[in-house]
Regions:
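Flexible, active-site-adjacent loop/turn segments at secondary-structure boundaries
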Residues: 33-35, 69, 91, 99, ...
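Extended, charge-enriched "interface" segments that sit outside catalytic cores
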Residues: 1-53
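Glycine-rich phosphate-binding loops that contact phosphosugars or nucleotide phosphates
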Residues: 53-214
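Short, flexible loop segments at the rims of nucleotide/cofactor-binding pockets, characterized by
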Residues: 38-44, 91-94, 215-217, 275-276
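Amphipathic coiled-coil/heptad-repeat helices and related helical stalk/stem segments
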Residues: 44-48, 101, 282
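Non-transmembrane, aqueous-exposed alpha-helical and coiled segments at domain scale
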Residues: 10, 142, 262-263
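Acidic catalytic cores of enzymes that act on phosphate-bearing nucleotides/polynucleotides
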Residues: 30-33, 51, 197-201, 211-286
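Glycine-/proline-rich flexible loop or hinge segments
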Residues: 30-38, 58-62, 282
Length: 286
């Protein structure tokens, strides 16, 4: 389990209880779904296993996504590299770079590759463009798409509607889960399960963290958040991770902060600027 070490004097709980209370109210309201994904996503594991069961010919999986539909998956792929039960290889394209697309496609064979198109809204322009590019590259007819593609999106989104029309299977993201916080939904669970990563262990770990905070009332995370917020001297937030396995996690951190706290407040450009570094390499160059 995670070990928390604080290198500063803790604040009295009275000073931060209001923040904890707001989070608890939000959790209990049911309006924000990511608090419950460690439970609700267990069914996704079985659904994903059922989907891939008769597709033993699939050796490689290409996930097309942007932002919240890719960053978290990349991080978990790096973390769970030694927690795999099959040999399926997971590739991720999260940019419209022609170089990346070309180099990735060279490694894939249409006959043994499953393409996952992931967009919560179903209208992410970069994802839709890459989807069309894949169809054109492999010269696929509409009638062939259901054999090679699967969608991850909101129920009744335009992507889901297209999937229904073409016979392409769709996994759904809960409506009350925002895209940037969706890694424990179908966004992350489906590709991880299909490629044999230990998704059940991941959800169990998330559940343990949830219980530490909400059930056992451990306050280290709140203490850290409060300290960093009240002691900052600049609008720059630096994450220094020690280990190459954190590269994907660092990218995810930047995406989460930039898309949330990094945005300007009102008309004042005072949002945080996130910077992610890998030690000891980046420390050496400082």
């Amino acid at each position: 389990m995670l070990k928390h070490t604080l290198f500063f004097e803790k604040e009295k709980l009275n000073g931060i209880l209001a923040y904890a209370s707001r989070m608890n109210d939000e959790r209990q309201s049911g309006e924000v779904g990511y608090y419950h994904l460690m439970d609700t996503s267990l069914a996704l594991i079985k659904e994903s296993e059922k989907f891939i069961k008769d597709k033993e010919h699939i050796k490689k999986v290409l996930l097309i996504g942007m932002g919240g539909s890719s960053c978290g998956v990349k991080a978990l792929k790096d973390f769970l590299f030694d927690e795999k039960s099959n040999e399926r290889e997971l590739f991720i394209i999260d940019n419209t770079s022609s170089h990346t697309f070309t180099q990735t496609i060279k490694k894939l064979n249409l006959k043994d590759t499953l393409f996952i198109i992931s967009s919560k809204t179903g209208t992410t322009i970069e994802v839709v463009s890459l989807f069309k590019l894949l169809i054109a590259h492999f010269k696929l007819e509409n009638s062939e798409l259901k054999k090679h593609f699967v969608f991850i999106t909101d129920e009744n989104s335009k992507l889901h509607q297209l999937g229904d029309k073409l016979g392409i299977y769709s996994f759904f993201v809960p409506q009350n889960v925002g895209g940037r916080f969706s890694v424990l939904s179908a966004i992350g669970i489906v590709p991880l399960v299909i490629c044999g990563y230990n998704a059940k262990g991941l959800l169990e770990g998330a559940k343990a963290c949830y219980e530490d905070f909400f059930t056992h009332k451990k306050d280290e995370i709140l203490q850290k958040a409060y300290h960093y917020c009240t002691h900052k001297n600049a609008h720059i937030n630096v994450l220094f991770s020690y280990g190459d396995a954190f590269k994907g996690f660092n990218e995810w951190f930047v995406q989460l902060i930039a898309e949330s706290l990094g945005k300007k407040q009102g008309y004042k450009r005072v949002g945080l600027t996130p910077i992610a570094l890998i030690g000891a390499r980046d420390q050496h160059s400082c």
